[in-house]
């Protein structure tokens, strides 16, 4: 198996359909001050009118039809990629007899939850039908991801219920909903990736009835999730196009819960001054702390805590694999320096572990902060996919950390993440994932791979056009780690809507003049990708010989680049300053 042909790959892209859907939602309405719910109802009416006009091929406009539950649902679903499944699934629910768009959106969430709940035990059932450990492992990954998706969706419904008490759905809450639904899309896709990567070892896996049965069973929830994401994304787009200002509430990391005000005061004052900080648990391998291992400290973290729980890890190398599940909220872990406090593991794909589970350190719970720690996967290039660090933590920050490995070193899987002054070392796709993530002031260092391999720094995995994910590398440095003679590229698009921007970064001579490479050799990526460069410097920044892809812009405008700043991509002004970490919002 050629290690460069990892499990990641393109799916089908229906660009014409996506373009048509976008046109349907770009409507101009003349409105005065009006509640969000009424505004959306008017938008729905306008969309319905447009659909009717187009169907009748009318040359002159006519008054919009009466707003009925049926026309409302049709209009809501018309902005989705799968309108038929949207209409059929929601219309079956008893409470669907409404014209209220927010209610219809909540019903779309109920559809996903019901569907995922009905198949949540399927991975475990299918696992009993095989003795193959690789298949069992992939099914276990899918089971965990389905559970995570269900938990996130229930949190989403709770967030909407809390917001309804305020009689409005703020733009910041809409961003939360988009993020969480984007992560649910990623959960589905990661399950499929875990099943697909089985093909790397044995060709018979490609025709496995067990894996095909699970994929088939998850097809409906995949469409339903995309539908809900499209609904909330298009509503936000309509409001934005109209220029209607929406009150943005100040919020910290607890999102739909009232976050303790103690955190902001504590974080601003102490995050950058850890020398005087009193941790809740101290880890020391020499016995001078409260516990000997990081895992022992993690076990002491309370579930879904609204107050910051602090773990201090003293200098030393801790050989262990750490997993912090979705119930571990608001945890800070810090060490004595990225070269002094090291957490080391060696799990890898070649030896039988799914890529998703190879991480030396994995975090799912929201509000995570890591400082002055090094994470390493020592498996080496010959072991192919071997993740050092994986994060699905929403509103997470990584400061002065290092992530060291070869293929697939750093995995910003989903949600919103910020990396500042960190070091990342690797070979193939060594920063990959589907999070909304910004790297600032980081040192990104490709290293020499195996003799038959190349280096690709990024592999972004946006699967759905409405996902709020993307990768931004801003004001960083890209340079070789040691003597690198292998062909080295800024990245390659992993999925149909992959989104990656390199901006204001010093690019070293290690990067080939073409800059980027296709996932499939000789085949340009789809035009639906969003790739670009902006005001980079250094010997590798010359764009005159760059690839000529339809979805790539070698010279982005100021306005285009602004979409990939901390302020815009992460809405970082709402939460990053509270952590005390240095950042540039623009």
UniProtKB/Swiss-Prot annotation:
Disruption phenotype: Reduced number of leaves at flowering time in long day conditions. Its EC number is 3.1.1.11. One of its GO terms (molecular function) is protein C-terminal methylesterase activity. The keyword Transit peptide does not apply. Keywords: Aspartyl esterase, Cell wall, Cell wall biogenesis/degradation, Disulfide bond, Glycoprotein, Golgi apparatus, Hydrolase, Membrane, Secreted, Signal, Stress response. It comes from the Eukaryota. In the N-terminal section; belongs to the PMEI family. Interacts with SBT6.1. NCBIfam families: PME_inhib (TIGR01614). The PMEI region may act as an autoinhibitory domain and prevent untimely PME activity during transport. The PMEI region is cleaved by SBT6.1 (S1P) in the Golgi apparatus prior to cell wall targeting. This is Pectinesterase 1. It comes from Arabidopsis thaliana (Mouse-ear cress).
